[in-house]
Amino acid sequence: MSEMKWAIITGADGGMGTEITRAVAKAGYRIIMACYHPQKAEVVRERLSKETGNPDLEVMAIDLSSMQSVVAFASQILERNLPISLLMNNAGTMETGFHTTSEGFERTVSVNYMGPYLLTRKLIPLMVRGARIVNMVSCTYAIGKLDFPDFFHRGKTGTFWRIPVYSNTKLALLLFTFELSEQLREKGISVNAADPGIVSTDIITMHKWFDPLTDIFFRPFIRKPKKGASTAISLLLDEKEAGVTGQLYVNNHRKNLSDKYTNHVQKEQLWEITERALASWLK
């Protein structure tokens, strides 16, 4: 397999992560499975390697809620000087309560936004021309709001509400996608976002975030991980998506967003504040 075909996939052992890893493995990439639970991921790695006939799958530990862990992970990749063709920021969480990380950030914000932001920024020097970055967002970006500085430390002023906080992180990740795509356009690196729809993943099945009435409303629309992952897989691998950048895709199609999002009034401000918040780890 080509030395130039390296892919990094966060949350590669989860529902959608497994589907994405399977597709990328079948396409012949050497894969770093960046996972929070290495032992669990090792079982998935072994199974996928046998299924796809691709022996070049490797598990590496990462805790996206810890910026120090993200830096340590990125440092290992940088030391190996791996030419990265694909970066899939797939991992995510929806905390059921308010949790502050050891670095002082709200945990949902760290895992869903700050960790992926930092990881991506650290790995850009290794990305080859034509590389693709895909960020997994959510339809909930539409109800997200960015209140600074509470966004980083509390997520929402006052009582912690998990769905609004989760939505805020997905809006932030979408705006990061748009801003980064502009900065990397001349380097020939594409940056896009994938909305998987409402998918049956650990966020739903383990955290039980919806009440019975919400369950009744959403259950008919909940997708299997394979279907939810299809849009991200298309953005990563389809030749017709080569060169496409700064877009949000839903159901394997480009979504036409209004200026409210593509030129969001807080897009540049979010970038600047995030850079300051992560300054000590971006060095």
Enumerate the predicted regions with their spans.
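Conserved glycine-rich cofactor-binding loop
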Residues: 13-14, 37
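Catalytic loop of short-chain dehydrogenase/reductase
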Residues: 92-100, 106, 132-187, 195-210, ...
